[in-house]
């Protein structure tokens, strides 16, 4: 899967790539000093976070359209993380950073309350076997975490091509009162007939796959 990527020895993530294991130990709860917005030159700007960035195509395409926003991509696969961080560095994209981490764990331990403007969850691993369903990003508990860290009126954007995972999303969203479901609008950088414009989407559009998306807007606590 990673054979087409450049050798790691030719990739430079300096200033753009962060690793969770290299960060100071996390506290019992997220602390201001752990806030990843501090990794940007302008930490006060709206902060968007993508879970599962792969090679970084969405971030590389979307961020120039919204230079007033900061974008953090979290990727678990080391080779993809390095490649995406190097892409951002070579382009001098000051509003993009990449993190190698378990996304849910990082959010729970290090993302402070009401700090995320938008979450992006595109083509997440469906983990189709029943015994692996607990590994799916969207769970009852993670929706509560997303609500904690999303700012008032902020959103969680979800896209998938996997029918069973889509049903899983709908089931969990239906019983979660923390978000209001809204129609999904394609990303600014998406081409006609695309929802996101990722490598994955472009690879499988010719096969006629059905892509579906939803937007969840954070409701204020009652």
Segments the model singles out, each with a brief description of its role:
Residues 109-118:
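A short acidic, Gly/Pro-enriched loop at the edge of an enzyme's catalytic core
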């Amino acid at each position: 899967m990673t054979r087409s990527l450049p050798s790691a020895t030719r990739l430079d993530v300096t200033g753009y790539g962060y690793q969770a294991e290299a960060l100071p130990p996390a506290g019992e709860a997220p602390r201001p000093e752990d806030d990843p917005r501090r990794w940007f030159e302008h930490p006060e700007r709206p902060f968007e976070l993508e879970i599962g960035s792969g090679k970084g195509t969405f971030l590389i395409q979307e961020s120039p359209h919204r230079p007033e926003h900061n974008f953090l991509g979290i990727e678990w696969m080391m080779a993809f993380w390095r490649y995406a961080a190097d892409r951002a560095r070579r382009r001098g994209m000051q509003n993009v950073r990449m993190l190698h981490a378990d996304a849910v764990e990082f959010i729970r331990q290090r993302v402070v309350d009401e700090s995320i403007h938008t979450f992006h969850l595109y083509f997440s691993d469906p983990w189709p076997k029943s015994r692996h369903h607990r590994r799916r990003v969207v769970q009852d508990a993670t929706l509560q975490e997303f609500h904690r860290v999303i700012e008032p009126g902020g959103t969680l954007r979800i896209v998938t091509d996997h029918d069973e995972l889509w049903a899983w999303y709908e089931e969990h969203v239906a019983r979660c009162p923390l978000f209001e479901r809204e129609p999904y609008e394609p990303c600014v950088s998406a081409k006609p007939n695309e929802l996101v414009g990722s490598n994955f989407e472009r690879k499988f559009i010719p096969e006629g796959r059905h892509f579906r998306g939803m937007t969840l807007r954070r409701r204020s606590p009652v």
